[in-house]
């Protein structure tokens, strides 16, 4: 009997060609991001010369280390495809329609940013933006974004801005949560795939949820965010899949609208550096509450000072150049201790490019007995 080739397995030639295409795709995005930042920085410094004194230059050695770290991240991204963590198509996922539509708006938005910088306005919102009901720490022009996180325009520009900031590898950084989450969910191997429930806290425009869907095609996915505008954008993105039914909630992560012990897995990407310390603890405790015993909680956020002291200048540059009022406290905070205080067991931390990852377990009775 003649065997049928498995279409999911690439031939060595196809695999090499696909990897080459992925490397070219990432290199193109990296070069474009560098060019964009170079031009926009020059323009900003010309308009506001004092900005140049706020940062310290990075050494050639540090720049080389960053470049090597980015390349390592791309290699890990490719290896996870080879391991079957997510399909190869995920590597080429882009937001080209949004890029073509909204990239010019990024340049048109620059004069507004310059005007706020000159007036030192960091909590500026349009008159028609509803601000009632939001915590004070949230009402900020994070990254100098016009209207903070509270307008549709901000939501439309966000993914472009973040991807350029991270040299075109923002989604690759997000995807590093997928392997530990998938490994953690093996605890529930007896649960049918369609009954697995995963929550993305501070889901924003839905990029992480889209990656989760590629990794867990049958799971029930949930997202929660404090911005109605970003939830609308997430709904738009996720609804591009005609079989998707986005389960999105508008809520503060300090008070999640979900029952106790509900989710098999919980993720949180790029949130904690934009929270004051008390809010970080409250969010972690809420994540503990809604996670099932035996469930996994994975955090992705900025690298911290204790892990990468050689990057101190770069970390200081980030908080100086972008409006990140809680960043200096965050890079010195111990999220491991916060996780354990909430009741989680910290399994491991990882560093990939500019991000740090915490993988935590909510102990069940079996785990507690084994540890005692």
Residue ranges: model-predicted function:
Residues 1-132:
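N-terminal accessory segments
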Residues 205-216:
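Conserved SAM-binding loop of SAM-dependent methyltransferases across substrates and taxa
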Residues 227-229:
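Conserved SAM/SAH-binding beta-strand->alpha-helix loop
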Residues 241-256:
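Conserved SAM-binding strand-loop segment of SAM-dependent methyltransferases
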Residues 254-266:
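A short acidic, Gly/Pro-enriched loop at the edge of an enzyme's catalytic core
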Residues 281, 298-342, 346-352:
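C-terminal alpha-helical "lid/dimerization" subdomain adjacent to the S-adenosyl-L-methionine
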Residues 281-293:
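A short glycine-rich, Lys/Arg-flanked "PGG" loop and its adjoining helix->strand segment in the class I
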Residues 342-372:
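Core SAM-dependent methyltransferase catalytic element
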């Amino acid at each position: 009997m003649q065997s049928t080739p498995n279409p999911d397995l690439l031939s060595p030639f196809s695999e090499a060609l696909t990897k080459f295409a992925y490397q070219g795709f990432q290199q193109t995005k990296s070069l474009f991001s560098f060019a964009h930042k170079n031009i926009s920085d020059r323009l900003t410094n010309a308009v506001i010369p004092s900005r140049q004194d706020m940062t310290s230059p990075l050494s050639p050695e540090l720049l080389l280390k960053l470049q090597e770290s980015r390349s390592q991240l791309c290699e890990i991204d490719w290896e996870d495809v080879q391991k079957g963590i997510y399909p190869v198509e995920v590597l080429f996922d882009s937001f080209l329609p949004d890029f073509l539509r909204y990239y010019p708006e990024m340049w048109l938005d620059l004069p507004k940013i310059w005007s706020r910088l000159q007036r030192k306005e960091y909590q500026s919102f349009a008159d028609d933006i509803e601000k009632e009901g939001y915590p004070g720490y949230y009402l900020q022009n994070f990254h100098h974004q016009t209207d903070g996180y509270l307008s549709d325009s901000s939501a439309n520009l966000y993914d472009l801005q973040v991807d350029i900031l991270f040299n075109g590898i923002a989604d690759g950084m997000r995807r590093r949560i997928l392997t530990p989450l998938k490994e953690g969910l093996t605890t529930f191997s007896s649960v049918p795939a369609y009954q697995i429930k995963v929550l993305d806290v501070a889901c924003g425009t839905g990029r992480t949820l889209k990656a989760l869907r590629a990794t867990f095609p049958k799971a029930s996915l949930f997202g929660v965010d404090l911005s109605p505008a970003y939830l609308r954008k997430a709904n738009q993105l996720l609804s591009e899949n005609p079989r998707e039914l986005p389960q999105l909630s508008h809520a503060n992560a300090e008070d999640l609208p979900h029952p106790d012990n509900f989710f098999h897995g919980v993720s949180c990407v790029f949130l904690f550096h934009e929270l004051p310390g008390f809010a970080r603890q409250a969010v972690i405790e809420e994540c503990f509450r809604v996670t099932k015993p035996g469930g996994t909680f994975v955090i992705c956020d900025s690298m911290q000072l204790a892990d990468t002291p050689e990057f101190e200048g770069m970390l200081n540059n980030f908080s100086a150049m972008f409006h990140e009022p809680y960043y200096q406290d965050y890079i010195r905070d111990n999220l491991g201790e916060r996780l354990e205080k909430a009741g989680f067991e910290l399994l491991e931390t990882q560093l990939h490019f500019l991000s740090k990852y915490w993988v935590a377990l909510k102990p069940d009775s079996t785990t507690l007995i084994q540890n005692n």
